[in-house]
Curated annotation (Swiss-Prot):
Keywords: Mitochondrion, mRNA processing, Transit peptide. It comes from Arabidopsis thaliana (Mouse-ear cress). It comes from the Eukaryota. Residues 174-401 are annotated as: Disordered. This is Multiple organellar RNA editing factor 1, mitochondrial. Residues 371-401 have a biased composition (Polar residues). Residues 310-327, 357-367 have a biased composition (Gly residues). Residues 1-60 form a transit peptide. The keyword Transit peptide applies. Belongs to the MORF family. It is found in: Mitochondrion.
Amino acid sequence: MAMISHRLRRALLTATSYVNRSISSSITPASDFPSVSAAVLKRSVIGRSTEVATRAPARLFSTRQYKLYKEGDEITEDTVLFEGCDYNHWLITMDFSKEETPKSPEEMVAAYEETCAQGLGISVEEAKQRMYACSTTTYQGFQAIMTEQESEKFKDLPGVVFILPDSYIDPQNKEYGGDKYENGVITHRPPPIQSGRARPRPRFDRSGGGSGGPQNFQRNTQYGQQPPMQGGGGSYGPQQGYATPGQGQGTQAPPPFQGGYNQGPRSPPPPYQAGYNQGQGSPVPPYQAGYNQVQGSPVPPYQGTQSSYGQGGSGNYSQGPQGGYNQGGPRNYNPQGAGNFGPASGAGNLGPAPGAGNPGYGQGYSGPGQEQNQTFPQADQRNRDWNNNNPAGQPGSDQVRSRSIMNLASFFFDILIRH
């Protein structure tokens, strides 16, 4: 910045001399201008440059008060752009890296004194009186009091890099930078404190980013492991959760019913769960409309609400070769001889057949390849205690309610299958 102000000052001086020459040339008549010889013009230019050169030292070392520049002020010869930059104090930087042996701090200071004496054409003792600061750490160079014309003599000296007008590093105390130098005595000063960047705001998604904000939590691999509800058979038990393989009790309770769900091989199908309470070690008992399953995967028959219904006879829930999950054939749940999801022809509702015993769940099932009154495994019979509470042929109020719900469910499933 100090170099910019120095160049700006020179530009102003050059512009002033150019304006003066323009005014003098405009006053001279046009007829007399060609008669002016080159020698006269040369003497005029030399005279003007000499006048400026002789006037500058008097101005620099005068007691005139300089005015610090403020935004909007007019820049004149007495304007100081930086506080302390009066063109009497100069900073000269040097470079010792090109030398074969590095210099110690004492050798650097001795080189500063010799360079100052050589540039000003004075002795080393006089140069020590001119120097007021130097540095061997933050930068390599020295500061000395001299005129602008004297500073130009340092351009061709070995080791000199920059020649800059110096300014205050501490305007309040009017202190220049570097270590203080007084007649060969160096007083070290701490380096200037630079204002650091503002730290970014803490990120709560990083470790150690601060307290009080939201943190990342680990997901639980099991969702909602809850025991079955205690109550009547007509109530709906809560979903038991979907545990990952190898955890829990070896049972996977898939998510609720999803229509048109396509699933790859060897993956547990997500079934329709209507009051389904799951036990230990039981296979996945799904029902799903439009569910496509590869052949060979074992699928138990449809399991509805916990109310029991008998199967067998003319009023049973008969199922033919295409009943249940059709494997390899049509992908819907159609009993034999029925165009919808419901009981066989001639059956009014899902109820116990004539002569049937206890209408327990999964008893009296008739189908191809199965004998009458064949029961399912114990793991597939849900809530057996509840099924034995009512005598044979006498359904309770919960059974009637469950049958009504089952009829409504079959009606809606039929609509889903058709559409």
